[in-house]
UniProtKB/Swiss-Prot annotation:
TM helices/strands, residue ranges: 9-29, 34-54, 82-102, 129-149, 156-176, 202-222
Natural source organism: Escherichia coli O157:H7
Motif (NPA 1): 63-65
Keyword NAD: no
Membrane topology, record value: Multi-pass membrane protein
Keywords: Cell inner membrane, Cell membrane, Membrane, Repeat, Transmembrane, Transmembrane helix, Transport
Reaction catalysed by this enzyme: H2O(in) = H2O(out)
NCBIfam families tied to this protein: MIP, PRK05420.1
GO cellular component: plasma membrane
Protein name: Aquaporin Z
Site (Selectivity filter): 43, 174, 183, 189
PROSITE patterns reported for this sequence: MIP (PS00221)
């Protein structure tokens, strides 16, 4: 079990460090930097690379909504859920702490003012989208993400391609929703940066736990009841 938890911790660390790091350090440097598309690709690449690296150890969840969604889909034991979620949150926070340290080396850096890659809705949405818009996009994309994960890891799916499908799915999710919520679909990712933003991000953090998890459960149940092939 320790190896599984370590894999989840390292994997989530990589996701936050690579994905949020690209948003904090590279998205707007210089001027446009890598932009939304670059950040979306970075998030997808973090999952793809770590799924190949440690997926065989822990399953490569790196996301509480994925862990709970896989449990809802009958793919993951309930007794391991809490340990996985704790490991994911710890890994994300460590990554965010290192990003904060790096970003603080630039004169004028202010995590609270910049948002520090935090997720938000309403006045804190990158595009000014409402709470309802954020609810719909996070719910639909979290459910869709779990459908992709269940399908790509199904025993009847082509072997060896799951990390590619899942990484590309996460890239697509970010391309769609960065303007709406700055893209969560992952409570551990949201928590990690919200701690260092320290203001509105913490006030809205509950939303980015509840909605992705509910969406993940919906996706897991849809695949389990409607799509999974029975022997």
């Amino acid at each position: 079990m320790f190896r599984k938890l370590a894999a989840e911790c390292f994997g989530t660390f990589w996701l936050v460090f690579g994905g949020c790091g690209s948003a904090v350090l590279a998205a707007g440097f210089p001027e446009l930097g890598i932009g939304f598309a670059g950040v979306a690709l970075a998030f997808g690449l973090t999952v793809l690379t770590m799924a190949f690296a440690v997926g065989h150890i822990s399953g490569g969840h790196f996301n509480p909504a994925v862990t709970i969604g896989l449990w809802a889909g009958g793919r993951f034991p309930a007794k391991e859920v809490v340990g996985y979620v704790i490991a994911q949150v710890v890994g994300g926070i460590v990554a965010a702490a290192l990003l904060y340290l790096i970003a603080s080396g630039k004169t004028g850096f202010d995590a609270a003012a910049s948002g520090f890659a935090s997720n938000g809705y309403g006045e804190h949405s990158p595009g000014g989208y409402s709470m309802l818009s954020a609810l719909v996009v996070e719910l639909v994309l979290s459910a869709g993400f779990l459908l992709v994960i269940h399908g790509a890891t199904d025993k009847f799916a082509p072997a060896g391609f799951a990390p590619i499908a899942i990484g590309l799915a996460l890239t697509l999710i970010h391309l769609i929703s960065i303007p709406v919520t700055n893209t969560s679909v992952n409570p551990a990712r949201s928590t990690a940066v919200a701690i260092f933003q320290g203001g509105w991000a913490l006030e809205q953090l509950w939303f980015f736990w509840v909605v992705p998890i509910v969406g993940g459960i919906i996706g897991g149940l849809i695949y389990r009841t409607l799509l999974e092939k029975r022997n």
